[in-house]
Design a protein with these regions (language model features):
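Long, polar/Ser/Thr-enriched low-complexity segments
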Residues: 1-117
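Charged linear interaction tracts used for macromolecular binding and regulation
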Residues: 73-231
Length: 231
């Protein structure tokens, strides 16, 4: 509220409509209030929500993202988190910032040209996720039987993920320990390969989506062909 001591024609101190008055060096001064920036448009709000969601997912999946994008990050003077956002922002869909959707099969936790492996359908029993892996490429200068196979189990409902190296390209029946809390929840399972030889150290394959798995059940789905971690 503005106050004046000398009538309507005098100066005033305080706010009057969109004008504020004050006394400066003995003079009565008025100036317009600074107006706030225009509210963000609907498109800006939506984009900000999409960035926020993929950023949060990247934090949950960081153990996988760190390994899967490490080689590309070094090659491009970038960060693993930045590359995860770049490769996955398009996986966030929807027109309502409060009801965004996620293309879980389309998520990429790694990126590269390394040849992949053949993966069976994942199954969770208790706290053990099991998946069978077999070599999909003859060893050559780009691949080696010692290449590491990573599996990631992601539970969006709990905002939790477990990722680890479960074995090598040589193949076998591999397991990954997951929290007991995953029971009854939808768990998305991914796999990728990281090179371990002198000619491909650190290089990655692209990510394969192996499907969803719950206790005693599974629903397999893969990218680029049945059971293949692609390069």
């Amino acid at each position: 509220m503005a106050k004046t001591n000398w009538g309507i024609t005098s100066g005033f101190i305080g706010k009057l409509g969109n004008v504020v008055g004050f006394n400066w060096k003995g003079k009565n001064v008025q100036r317009a209030l600074v107006q706030g920036a225009d509210p963000r448009s609907g498109a800006q709000i939506l984009q900000r929500a999409r960035f926020g969601m993929i950023g949060q997912m990247g934090s949950v999946l960081y153990d996988a993202v760190y390994e899967g994008f490490r080689h590309e990050a070094r090659s491009n003077s970038s960060t693993q988190s930045g590359l995860f956002l770049k490769h996955n922002l398009s996986a966030i869909g929807g027109t309502d910032p409060e009801a965004l959707t996620v293309d879980y099969p389309g998520l990429q936790l790694s990126y590269g040209k390394l040849k992949g492996v053949e993966c069976g359908t994942p199954v969770i029993n208790g706290t053990t996720l099991s998946v069978t892996v077999s070599n999909a490429a003859a060893p050559n200068r780009r691949t080696a039987l010692t290449d590491r196979v990573y599996v990631c189990a992601y539970c969006p409902a709990l905002e939790d993920a477990v990722c680890g190296c479960v074995g090598t390209r040589a193949g076998g029946d591999f397991t990954l320990t997951v929290p007991a809390g995953y029971a009854g929840e939808t768990v998305h399972v991914y796999a990728f390969v990281i090179g371990a030889s002198s000619t491909n150290e650190g290089q990655a394959s692209t990510t394969a989506y192996l499907g969803t798995a719950g206790n005693g059940s599974s629903s397999g789905r893969n990218t680029g062909g049945p059971g293949t971690v692609n390069g």
